[in-house]
């Protein structure tokens, strides 16, 4: 059995997220169909993370097990011939059996794009959040720096991450079983501290202006559900003056989702890279 590492880029606008879902178009489900068409195997690819509906990826990492002898270079070409243009396989390589796209990751980087111009082109609109209204960007820069380091990010998680993870894992196994898919997604008996709590380490959190775009870059050892978009939503409230820079520290300490701002739209978010 071969364990392959794929690097994917995709336009999340066309999909209901990464994870396979009944009667909805997903990135994972589309990849399942492409692999079955190519190899005749029913296998469930595992991503480094489950991007939500509308979230894009420049370099999502995927592991997939297969008995197919197709060389990796040929596999890339063949999959790209089958997949829709909104998904591209950028690279593929053989990995040892223990390598797993999610569990082996040590860091991820996301970027969030806000378009600040008065008029947003329709060709750009699906890849940014258009916000032409006044913002104090200097305060947003200050606020972003406060989340660097190790913190409990419960206030910025959509739901209890542990409960959600268990539910998603159960759903994944159920769907895989119903579809007769082979998967290497079984969790190890001993879960790491990172998987058991809401504490994450953020190595970089910064806003930068590039012409008419305000771009937030965040790199960390892991992210909770909606964490990046909830951070962005809160930083936007700081920029608008509804929250102060000091409020961000207070929100972190409260460990209460209701203390933070609304979730920013999915369109501006990109998974940029995954490190191993």
Regions found by a protein language model. Name each.
Residues 1-276:
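Structured-RNA-binding interfaces characteristic of tRNA pseudouridine synthases
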């Amino acid at each position: 059995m071969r364990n392959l590492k794929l690097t994917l880029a995709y336009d999340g606008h066309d999909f209901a997220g990464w994870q396979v879902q009944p009667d909805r178009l997903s990135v994972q489900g589309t990849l399942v169909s492409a692999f079955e068409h190519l190899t005749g195997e029913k296998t469930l690819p595992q991503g480094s993370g489950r991007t939500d509906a509308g979230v894009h990826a420049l370099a999502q990492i995927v592991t997939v097990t297969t008995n197919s002898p197709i060389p990796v270079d040929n596999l890339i070409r063949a999959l790209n011939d089958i997949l829709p243009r909104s998904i591209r396989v950028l690279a593929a390589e053989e990995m040892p059996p223990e390598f797993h796209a999610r569990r082996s990751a040590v860091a991820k980087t996301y970027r969030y794009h806000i378009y600040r111009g008065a008029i947003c082109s329709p060709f750009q609109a699906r890849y940014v959040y258009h916000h032409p209204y006044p913002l104090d960007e200097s305060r947003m820069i200050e606020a972003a720096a406060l989340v660097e380091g190790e913190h409990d990010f419960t206030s910025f998680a959509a739901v209890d991450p542990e409960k959600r993870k268990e539910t998603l894992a159960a759903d994944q196994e159920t769907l895989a079983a119903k579809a007769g898919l082979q998967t290497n997604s079984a969790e190890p008996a001993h879960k790491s501290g990172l998987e058991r709590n809401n504490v994450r380490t953020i190595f970089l959190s910064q806003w930068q202006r590039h012409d008419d775009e305000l771009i937030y870059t965040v790199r960390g050892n892991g992210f909770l559900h909606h964490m990046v978009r909830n951070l962005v939503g809160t930083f936007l409230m700081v920029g608008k003056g509804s929250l102060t820079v000091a409020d961000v520290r207070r929100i972190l300490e409260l460990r209460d989702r209701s203390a933070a701002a609304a979730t920013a739209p999915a369109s501006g978010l990109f998974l940029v890279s995954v490190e191993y």
